[in-house]
Amino acid sequence: MPSSSNSAAFSLDEFAKALDKHDYHAEKGQTVHGKICQHANEGVYVDFGGKSPGFVPVQELGLRPHAEIEDSFPLDSAWDFLVTSEQNDEGQVRLSRRQLQIQQSWENLAELEESGKTLEMVVTGTNKGGVVGDVEGLRGFIPRSHLMHKDNMDALVGQVLKAHILEANQDNNKLVLTQRRIQQAESMGKIAAGNIYEGKVAKIQPYGVFVEIEGVTGLLHVSQVSGTRVDSLNTLFAFGQAISVYVQEIDEYKNRISLSTRILETYPGELVEKFDEMMADAPNRLPLVQSKQNLGDKQEQLEKS
């Protein structure tokens, strides 16, 4: 019959093996949930059910510094952490809340990029190319050419800017934003179909003239220039030239504005023959446009009847 000491030793061995068998092993890259169990000068210890408490260095407690660790992470408070190391000989792993937050921020940005929704960036500084700032704890950049207000970038420091994502690359830690879509949306709200506006010629193509109105660009198609044939648009229009146009249609979904000067003519070819005179009187011709449209509606009704 075995002695009691051997029996006790056997039981202790079996107990140790059972502990090893059922020990919780946290893998690197895994997310764990645990409670703060100890504070230290260099960080905090977290009980997440492992063989030993995990350690979180003070710089890994969050995306932004914490003045008083004890206040921000009181004992027994529960948090999620990312395992950033393999277990050492004592079974301890290193944890990070900061890197978990970074992962979550990139995931949020991917959703915002896909949905096309706006986000906010707190401007923290400027450089020759534009402004930099904080976006969910990540470093964002808006090129100067994509800013709504670019004349005094230093005045933007400390401000919260709304923007859309131009490029989000987690592998390269690159986040580039733009305010152009917001600017376009605001500008689109300043104009309405059925009105006459003054704009400037922004570009001339064989198929039409691009005209900038209130910060957005519309197309004056060659077929809508005049009631008579126009062989060369360059004979009538020049870059930067101020002209009056009628807004026929605004397609916000396609971000497209259709313009016309043809509808402003009192007779076909007036724009070609008397360009300056017609442009000078164009702002007064909305009643003419409306009468033409009413006549067109009546003709359409007669054709259908």
From Swiss-Prot:
Secreted in keyword set: no
Domain of life: Bacteria
Keyword vocabulary terms for this entry: Repeat, Ribonucleoprotein, Ribosomal protein, RNA-binding
Database matches in Pfam families: S1 (PF00575)
GO CC annotations on file: ribonucleoprotein complex; ribosome
Keyword Nuclease applies: no
Domain S1 motif positions: 29-98, 116-180, 194-262
BP-aspect Gene Ontology terms: translation
Molecular-function GO terms, alphabetical: mRNA binding; structural constituent of ribosome
Family annotation (InterPro entries): NA-bd_OB-fold, Ribos_protein_bS1-like, Ribosomal_protein_S1-like, S1_domain
Classification via Gene3D superfamilies: Nucleic acid-binding proteins (2.40.50.140)
SMART domains in the cross-refs: S1
Sequence similarity: Belongs to the bacterial ribosomal protein bS1 family.
Role description: Binds mRNA.
UniProt-recorded name of the protein: Small ribosomal subunit protein bS1B
Organism encoding this protein: Synechocystis sp. (strain ATCC 27184 / PCC 6803 / Kazusa)
Upper taxonomic lineage: Bacteria, Bacillati, Cyanobacteriota, Cyanophyceae, Synechococcales
